[in-house]
């Protein structure tokens, strides 16, 4: 007799996607027991069994499975509303967690004879098991919806199989990813959906094929498609092993290959091979051993979640060898185990925005349509019923809009949960709308049939689902998505938006529908709160949308309103205001430095360095999206974040951004240190005084030194001493405004440097004071003895007239006026310098273009 845990199915139960779980001391006799044959026909069969050494071990597995699948259990029955594959994976995880040895048998048959029939003694239904050990294996409804999509309907969202020629950005991504792997051992490639991450992964893993490579994917369908693409790119199946639970043979041209979950075969081949490519699902990763030179984690945001060992985190948390490459379109940062963890994930080595893919022609464009609530629907008494009816009417309005632009539109509707999907489906069908529904509690065959019907329909059709089709599913003819419930996760939002964006010849732009409860002219900003997370997520992927929010009059964006009862223009303005300033309407959320689109801001920084031959000044402005921004604020944030990154501290910058900065001329010296580096200037001052018998000679402290990258040491010293002279007499510290004209507004260490250097030559550099305050007349003019810095400036003014050779040597180009404007003359004349940022007393902020015709004067 053979004891074991089993999952059995009967045709009557299978129609409802129900499966019987249990344990027995005699697998050969169990399905012939009276409890099975009395109420059912004799059509029982095993889906699979886990043969165990003892019946008690099998009982523990059953108890563990029922505990972990409690949300999918029929009350007081050993029936689970889960796919057999899910129960199998769960049972194996439970057995491994409880250290129970087992033999997995798929669809087994056992010989039955008279001696097999044994009456089994009853046993406690709930044996002692450590639920704390199994807590991380508990399946929640949301998690199961995700995993179901992984294994059943995970379709490719990358390039088509005929696209083999590398795109420019793919080569760039591969180069930057490989460089970061060599530098730190970890790299993230964040690339928009449908932009060919698999091709980039192939270009990188080609450098590791002499060793062992592991390619992890979140589902069996994606495993097969990844294999097909890599085979198309030139990978030989000779050195490929597939680790997954699908026993179907895969045929590629004349080559064939099969998956395996046999741990003996897997471990032996990995350990004995000198070169090997293993493609495995995350769910099967516990069968692998830590012996890889490169590990690629596709759709790596799925790894994130609770900080605990589970199939998706097994390799990340337990494997120590090899480089790690992570691929995703939507990083996840809102979980305990998140991609902010640089030690585990590294940083983003390459970033490719959704808008870039659209403009390059690889991704279909889209429009936003906000759908207003029906005018009188809010007057009903039942709030829950009202919301349901509002959404139904908004869905019908959206479908009607699509019919005017598309011949046979197809629209995905994402609901809050399965309950809402069922309710909306019933309402729509009653109203005669052609609607379909799919969710994880339906049998697999029903879901596939529904999906096929949706894809092949020649009539306008709606498909309601919760999360089943949110990620990875490709419907070539899909025209629109409708959010029937607010989404707060940027990952969920972007993945859902990308569903209809696959590029096809003559396919019209897609439509994203956002329903809002705005039904009167007295609109409250709180009504727009549901779209703020959506707008934040989209703005991070689409710089054009970000620019539009800053100034819609200058940057157009395809956004409109359906069913508005008031002025559409006013409603859109209110929506933009709520997105930018929040529902309280107070703080500008968009102009924070970290939210400024990197590529646009860095392009302006690079232009300033390369064309103007300098780094930004305090009063430089930036014109972006029609908004007036102070560029120096962003620039200071960049420097701070860069220093944090280099000091291995938490930083807002990613590796690709650091590489951008370090590609600029003199970034680590002039970019970070500024045009007037203190230590460098003090060293020059000390040498100068020693060589010139303690005489400062001539220094310009009126305009300060030239700030260009080609500035001479004397020009940089002029800038430093200009600052010293201006700050003498001002307080240092947070309360300096309360102590005017007293103290010194410079760090104490720098004051010590000046005392030491000037003190060697008995030079006075501080201004005179009376009881701690500067000596001044009633008009504020300094009346004390001049300092050596002031005396050097008087000499400088004389030299400008009498000693042009000296001026040209230490201040080259001074006579041409570059000192006055701190710009190269030809840059000034052509108007290529950054505009000046100025905030006026009336609250307005303007950019004043620097040019000879418009002098830089107060307005």
Swiss-Prot record:
Keyword NADP on this protein?
Answer: no
Enumerate the PROSITE patterns for this protein.
HELICASE_ATP_BIND_1, HELICASE_CTER
Q: Which InterPro entries match?
A: Helicase/UvrB_N, Helicase_ATP-bd, Helicase_C-like, Helicase_Restrict-Modif_Enz, P-loop_NTPase, Phage_T5_Orf172_DNA-bd
Q: Which residues are involved in binding ATP? A: 191-198
Q: What domain of life is recorded for the organism?
A: Viruses
Q: EC?
A: 3.6.4.-
Tell me the ranges covered by the Helicase C-terminal domain, including all copies. Answer: 394-553
Keywords of the record, alphabetical order, are: ATP-binding, Helicase, Hydrolase, Nucleotide-binding
Under the GO molecular function aspect, what terms does this record hold?
Answer: ATP binding; DNA binding; helicase activity; hydrolase activity
Membrane-spanning intervals of the chain: none
Q: Does the keyword Nucleotide-binding apply?
A: yes
Residues covered by the Helicase ATP-binding domain: 178-349
Q: What class of enzyme is it?
A: hydrolase
Q: DEAH box: where is this motif?
A: 298-301
Family to which the UniProt record says this protein belongs:
Belongs to the asfivirus helicase A859L family.
Q: Under which name does UniProt file this protein?
A: Probable helicase A859L
Organism of this sequence: African swine fever virus (isolate Pig/Kenya/KEN-50/1950) (ASFV)
